[in-house]
């Protein structure tokens, strides 16, 4: 039926199961000085940086694409928990979730996004970086393998720049494959979330 609403097979039970699987599947890889869970009394200004904080990771990738009634982004979830303590900076741009091509992002755009993120980070008490892989071509997508182990779109440089500010940094990544972590010694915590579905 071409007129069927996408996600019409979903139920609250599906979303409950998705949330439980997500909670149990997240992996804590580093947690220096018990930075996590966040002590909300300690941090008045929490900056979230990274495109994956707002990007729908249920879209794209070929056959791994999900058809859901709604997604809850990490940023929406954090705002629900911490309210107006949360600020956001995109930090980088990856383009659309295409199956067989990559959008060309001008260097000036990436430079400006990184600059804006670093400016906001200087005013924050703690930084939550939400990035990693996505469902774009040459990422976690059919019809094209990744070309190297580095995080794309200048993410390693952005994370290194955030860590250089000497503030607590939590790196939260999404993705289904391994990646290089040249900044690991300079961040306080690393959490890997895989792909969590509609209840990210």
Walk through the language-model features, giving the residues of each.
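Conserved, charged catalytic cores of large soluble enzymes
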Residues: 1-7
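C-terminal non-catalytic regions of proteins with extracellular/luminal or membrane-system context
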Residues: 8-12, 16-200
């Amino acid at each position: 039926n071409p007129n069927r609403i996408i996600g019409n097979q979903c139920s609250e039970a599906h979303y409950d199961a998705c949330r439980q699987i997500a909670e149990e599947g997240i992996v804590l890889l580093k947690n220096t000085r018990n930075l996590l869970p966040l002590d909300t009394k300690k941090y008045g200004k929490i900056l979230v940086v990274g495109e994956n904080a707002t990007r729908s990771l249920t879209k794209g990738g070929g056959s791994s694409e999900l058809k859901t009634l709604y997604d809850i982004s990490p940023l929406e979830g954090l705002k629900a928990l911490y309210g107006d303590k949360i600020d956001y900076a995109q930090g980088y741009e990856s383009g659309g979730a295409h199956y067989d091509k990559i959008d060309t992002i001008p260097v000036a755009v990436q430079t400006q996004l990184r600059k804006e993120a670093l400016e906001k980070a200087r005013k924050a008490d703690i930084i939550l970086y939400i990035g990693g892989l996505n469902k774009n071509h040459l990422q976690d997508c059919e019809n094209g393998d990744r070309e190297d182990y580095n995080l794309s779109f200048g993410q390693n440089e952005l994370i290194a720049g955030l860590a250089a500010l000497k503030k607590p940094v939590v790196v939260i990544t999404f993705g289904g494959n391994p990646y290089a972590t040249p900044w690991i010694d300079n961040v306080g915590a690393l959490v890997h979330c895989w792909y969590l579905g509609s209840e990210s």
